Amino acid sequence: MSCRELVILGCSSQQPTRTRNQGAYLFRWNNEGLLFDPGEGTQRQFIFANIAPTIVSRIFISHFHGDHCLGLGSMLMRLNLDKVTHPIHCYYPASGKKYFDRLRYGTIYHETIRVIEHPIDKEGIVEDFGNFRIEARKLNHLVDTLGWRITEPDTIKFIPEKIKAAGLRGPIMQDLLRNEHVTVNGKTLYLKDLSYIRKGDSIAVIADTLPCPSIVDLAKNARIMLCESTYLEEHSHLAESHYHMTAKQAATQALAAGAQQLVLTHFSARYLNSKEFEIEAGKIFPNVTAAEEFRSYPFPKNPSSK
């Protein structure tokens, strides 16, 4: 079974602290590495996390404020240095194309990796392929900003006791999957009676924003909702003026979305203890954690979920 986890590579906002680097978030999932908003120093954070950067296959930039993208250039150069053979897909708001190019080509180096750009100029499904469906929606920030929902496909799971009772095994199982029915000893057996659909898991990544309807749409029933909460309620006036959320607001959005787990991040440097965010949000949404540098949040596949 492939590794399925969120790894926090950084969880500060614009200004890093002694214990928190600028944000960067890695989802290891279905043999891919999904890297979100690599801030300054992300390449080095991989070393401290003891994770090979070569796992990265897709990079998502929510918007082009520096703390969400300054690590992009060095990450691409590192992947180039490591001679990765898989393509690197990059997703970002189309309005930020010039900033993407500046980050990618800001220094002299010989690029040999294959970078596939996905500049996004409209909301909805960005890609739908074997491993994932990628959805983007606009958030409410000071510049064009995207939130993300990543969903794995549904899968058909056989019900072991029914398969055993029917006496099915071997190649006929593939026939059953392909044709949705088989005939055994003159009796027709149907796939729908011997199996169930396992709904694919979803994760949501909510970057800088005020509360808005897109958040609930993206995080609906998500296994993990990774969400910015730059401020505590005592500084809600700052959150509003800078187009950010408080921990309480993030928790309210998670509750409305029916998310299973909320991971708060993007903490202002004014706060030394991120546990205060957990306490504030936990009054509304109990299954909440304040992100910690290099902490891992597994979300193992539940084979019996329907």
UniProtKB/Swiss-Prot annotation:
GO: which molecular function terms? Answer: 3'-tRNA processing endoribonuclease activity; zinc ion binding
Catalytic positions are D67
Q: Where does Zn(2+) 1 bind?
A: H63, H65, H141, D208
Record note on cofactor: Binds 2 Zn(2+) ions.
| Top-level taxon of origin | Bacteria
Q: Which residues form a coiled coil?
A: none
What NCBIfam families does the annotation carry? PRK00055.2-1, RNase_Z
Q: Which family does it belong to?
A: Belongs to the RNase Z family.
Protein name as catalogued:
Ribonuclease Z
Q: Which organism is it from?
A: Chlamydia abortus (strain DSM 27085 / S26/3) (Chlamydophila abortus)
